[in-house]
């Protein structure tokens, strides 16, 4: 089971958990909550497998056997695995907050004043979709050693800052229930982090590609 496949699968699972954690705000079903918990466990298991493979490879200098061109790629993949684990962990944290909220509502310890604002929720889903797309592109660029693709990802991240600020202003302008507002801010922050992870992976891909090009010139 190649480490690249493990990382790909981890990313799919973690992003799915993140998406479900946002959907769970409107559909607070036990099944959806459990889906995020299960996904977090699956991502963790794959993460442990990937780390063991990396540790085994670096101890025996088996970078070529793992499909790497230089030993430095061990660190790159370790960072990516950490980022993906953080995505699933943040999704689980959101679900834990929603579970606490729902329990307080069920026990009538808490009364939500208003329904979820559709405009805010729709824009949050849109921002989250952009975050997912950016992260998926960063993983593809890393695997393909795509220098130009990595550059585009960094530019896109900068362009999404305005969209993020607009969403923050929209949330601030609305009279949201404080409990719902806190969870919405958590979800927005999780989406922003995914974009930052994508940017970091793209920057690492750029650095790796430049180093490989320079090395090839030195050899010639």
Residue ranges with predicted function:
Residues 1-220:
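Cytosolic, long alpha-helical scaffolding segments
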